[in-house]
Amino acid sequence: MAPPPPPPPRLLLASHAAVRAAASARRGRLAGDHHPPQVAALRRGDWVKLICGASFEDAADVRNLSLVYTLAGVDCIDCAADASVVGAVNEGIDVAASIVPSVQSPWVMISVNDDCRDLHFRKAEFDPEDCPPDCSKPCEKVCPADAISLERVMIEGKHSQSDPSSGKLEGGVITERCYGCGRCLSVCPYDRIRAMSYVRDPTKTAELLKRNDVDAIEIHTTGKGTDMFNTLWSNLDDSINNVKLIAVSLPDVGDSTVNFMNAIYTTMQSHLQGYNLWQLDGRPMSGDIGRGATRETVSFAVHLSSMSNRPPGFYQLAGGTNSYTIESLKKAGLFQSTTFAATSGVTDCQQAFIGGIAYGGYARKIVGRVLRKIPAQFGHARIEDHPDYLLEALQEALSLVGPVKGYPTLPSL
């Protein structure tokens, strides 16, 4: 049995007292709201989801990210549809609750796809023996997940350290860390890197949905046709009834988007016993790049806001989201702006048109740079064993979650 986490530092508890007070104040504005707190957040427009990555399977990092963002107050943690990853998310949530017992546990969501063309479900692959030994390794430098590790080693019988041809490259892609962003594909000067796509097994997905530690599912679809979605939906069968929320992630495919969404919703209605959500996927896996990455998801929201025939459900931004997303939403007049809508499970109510924001690459980046500070000799470190780093990571997470939730500005920890 793992030892209990160290007592939380006083500053951590103080910061959470302020966070909880702010959250309580927000909940108080919806007196009489008997929906789960996650749904109440969607109605207000202050839902926040952490995206660990549909293909990111580094359990140690997922655990620490889940711990930190649970403490920061996210409503949902979205992860790969893999049993070990789901276990890591729940372990992180449990440790967060042991540090601050009053913390709200987020829903755990698994992500699957109906089509191998979805960019979130692929891994980079190459053979380092095919790489020239004098390669400058741009793939290693550009990877946001530190998923490529290459080292030049000497070839037996050759002893010149100064001559690159006397060595070879070893290593390659760290598969569990690669989440398919594709940035390495375009920078390889020798075109040696391939993207290997895959589709999650619906049978294994159905088994995960029957567990008591999975609350939601997100189905990624390309918007290129409903047949594959319908097939996946049929294969999941009654297992879909075990979750509280069903999300569909899709790109803006232009004028046909709303018709496609309505066709999907018609299929879903046969088993839709809980809540449903539409994830507006703007520019996938790009939030860590910079300010402009968030434009596409906000434009998608603006597009749908003018469509009176859009299907019922909550709406949430993703794909390129970062610290500039709220500013862009405000400029568009869509940040926590209410509308009269019918939502599955919540009928005829005033609620925010954009229920919230999902943060992926950017959220992982700002906390990940703290995780990387933990000395390497600790191996797969538990961040709670390093209180100073935990506080620093929490400060980073709060800087992202706080503006959506309306938390008071906290002093530097």
What are these regions (language model features)?
Residues 61-63, 75-81, 182, 186, ...:
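Conserved mixed alpha/beta catalytic, RNA-binding, or beta-rich assembly cores of soluble enzyme
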Residues 136-166, 171-172, 182-199:
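Iron-sulfur cluster-binding cysteine motifs and their immediate structural context
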Residues 13-28, 39, 117, 355-413:
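Extended, intrinsically disordered, low-complexity segments
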Residues 70, 132, 140, 144, ...:
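Non-catalytic positions within long, well-ordered alpha-helices that form the structural scaffold/packing
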Residues 2-53, 105, 410-413:
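N-terminal amphipathic alpha-helix/helix-capping segment at the start of soluble metabolic enzymes
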Residues 97-124, 157:
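Glycine-rich, aromatic-flanked loop segments that form ligand/cofactor-binding clefts
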Residues 44-61, 113-134, 167-176, 189-203:
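Active-site mouth loops of central-metabolism enzymes
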Residues 89-97:
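Glycine-rich loop at the start of a catalytic domain that most often binds anionic cofactors/ligands
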